[in-house]
Amino acid sequence: MPKLRSATSTEGRNMAGARALWRATGVKDNDFGKPIIAISNSFTQFVPGHVHLKDMGQLVAGAIEEAGGIAKEFNTIAVDDGIAMGHGGMLYSLPSRELIADSVEYMVNAHCADALVCISNCDKITPGMLMAALRLNIPVIFVSGGPMEAGKTKLSDKLIKLDLVDAMVAGADDRVSDADSEQIERSACPTCGSCSGMFTANSMNCLTEALGLSLPGNGSMLATHADRRELFLEAGRRIMDLTTRYYRDDDQSALPRNIANFNAFENAMTLDIAMGGSSNTVLHLLAAAIEAEVDFSMDDIDRLSRLVPHLCKVAPSTPKYHMEDVHRAGGVMGILGELDRAGLLHNDAYHVAGSNLAEVLAKYDIAQSKDEAVHKFFSAGPAGIPTTKAFSQDCRWDSVDIDREAGCIRTREFAFSQEGGLAVLSGNVALDGCIVKTAGVEVENHTFIGSARVYESQDDAVAGILGGEVVEGDVVVIRYEGPKGGPGMQEMLYPTSYLKSRGLGTKCALITDGRFSGGTSGLSIGHVSPEAAAGGTIALVNTGDRIEIDIPARSIKLAISDVELAARRTAMEALGKDAWKPVGRVRQVSMALKAYALLATSADKGAVRDTSKLG
């Protein structure tokens, strides 16, 4: 039977000083010997997805203490990618993932916590905490802050749904009046919660359900809805159950590495492809797999992308559906249920909500469940009232959406497409692969041949797009924005938004060793590996080169001869210390970012640290 980790700091005469300090935090005599549960909360007033989390840790703590544990809360940082977008702040977003993972490890190991509750929500916070949880391998459960309600407003007497991306596009579109742009801005992000589409934050929170590490509804129940309160309370109760199973009963299935095993990672990626999730999820799943010591790679993602249909289409891939609509249609469990019936899931995978995924689906998949409480749970809807408060409303849809032919979630037979929402491309431009979110690409753009327009930074690309340099038929190439070359692998939401605002969204392509926001749509190909700074071919592309993109064939090609490509590589290497560096780019890089870049790997490895350099 495993011994409580916390006994290290609570048992024995030589721990008198530590016990004295525990007492100073409120621990009583009869508390010693109980499991200590760490609560990692990411509350901050900087981020709408986290602004409502201040009291959530203590809500969970109360449930833990009622169930016989000791709860101790600490905080991590959280970067808002939308606010950091379009300027030097974006350099810090991806590196913050590693800091979050490390900070959770530091706090949990320094204080010998026995188990962990992760209260996360936005883009890098859920992945960072996931990496830490799998690194630590102690009982864990995730509970997120939940998605924002979709924005709604009337334009030209028509009620439309909105999100952050609509505000960005309208702000850069000269055809949109100042009044309309301001109206869109004021309506786009009406409540607390993670941005309302299938962007990175919501994608990752959905994937924790598929990995088996969070409760049903975690990824889709609105932040504002009163029903979400029960998810936090149940998370507190469940972590105590997991803790008891492991430490008292020696039940190894309660540990995250045994829940999030290879089959669970396949389930998560299958869900991601089926729902057209953010391409960033590829980066984060690869990183999490490394922490879990699971051999899950780009090859596995490529294989799955050829098998899994696109069953759920959500903003930014369509203006019709947002996360509130996904929840009404049964949430993640609704999508997983259809995947299970299509024979595409490992339904024997362990899950924190039941003995295995099959058991959880039997109860929570509204297409098969007759449980009235479950149907009521998924009827939770938006109130349409701007607020920063959690649990502030109890509105419900008149009915849940079980239309699997023309609804938000479809069966395999009636899928939005038989090709999934993400694809891995490879070729001489990306020898180790790159990612495209096919869910956001028009069918006519699935094959594209164009002329390269090369930029050494996102800033230069934005200036080129807004200045009219980029024209129909161009393939915009943005390089030296990878994990090492940026450093920090910036998101390219502004370049893609500005292409849309200039009417070029379906008339140009964009490829980069950087990455894209989950809000990106259009022929946007990111994560090109190896990156330019690591000697990748993308560094050898010249303006005017022909680039051929073929999504059905999963290929991307720089159309020059092998002889010419080799000559360019030789010329680059001859530059010595100036080789594989951007030409003419002026960028202030802090010591913190330089330290990150020193160990950063390319995107095909999850942009994690290259631990081989640590000895």
From Swiss-Prot:
Pathway: Amino-acid biosynthesis; L-isoleucine biosynthesis; L-isoleucine from 2-oxobutanoate: step 3/4; Amino-acid biosynthesis; L-valine biosynthesis; L-valine from pyruvate: step 3/4
One Gene Ontology term of the molecular function aspect: magnesium ion binding
Record-linked SUPFAM superfamilies: IlvD/EDD N-terminal domain-like, LeuD/IlvD-like
Enzyme class: lyase
Keywords: 2Fe-2S, Amino-acid biosynthesis, Branched-chain amino acid biosynthesis, Iron, Iron-sulfur, Lyase, Magnesium, Metal-binding
Gene3D superfamilies: IlvD/EDD C-terminal domain-like (3.50.30.80)
Active-site residues per Swiss-Prot or TrEMBL entry: S517
Biological processes annotated in GO: isoleucine biosynthetic process; L-valine biosynthetic process
Binding-site list for Mg(2+): D81, D123, K124, E491
Catalysis performed (reactions): (2R)-2,3-dihydroxy-3-methylbutanoate = 3-methyl-2-oxobutanoate + H2O; (2R,3R)-2,3-dihydroxy-3-methylpentanoate = (S)-3-methyl-2-oxopentanoate + H2O
Enzyme Commission designation: 4.2.1.9
Cofactor binding note: Binds 1 [2Fe-2S] cluster per subunit. This cluster acts as a Lewis acid cofactor.
GO cellular component: cytosol
Binding positions for [2Fe-2S] cluster per the UniProt entry: C122, C195
Record bears the keyword Transit peptide: no
Cofactor(s) it depends on: [2Fe-2S] cluster; Mg(2+)
N6-carboxylysine PTM sites in chain numbering: K124
Family classification: Belongs to the IlvD/Edd family.
Function: Functions in the biosynthesis of branched-chain amino acids. Catalyzes the dehydration of (2R,3R)-2,3-dihydroxy-3-methylpentanoate (2,3-dihydroxy-3-methylvalerate) into 2-oxo-3-methylpentanoate (2-oxo-3-methylvalerate) and of (2R)-2,3-dihydroxy-3-methylbutanoate (2,3-dihydroxyisovalerate) into 2-oxo-3-methylbutanoate (2-oxoisovalerate), the penultimate precursor to L-isoleucine and L-valine, respectively.
Subunit composition and interactions: Homodimer.
Name under which the protein is recorded: Dihydroxy-acid dehydratase
Lineage, opening ranks: Bacteria, Pseudomonadati, Pseudomonadota, Gammaproteobacteria, Alteromonadales
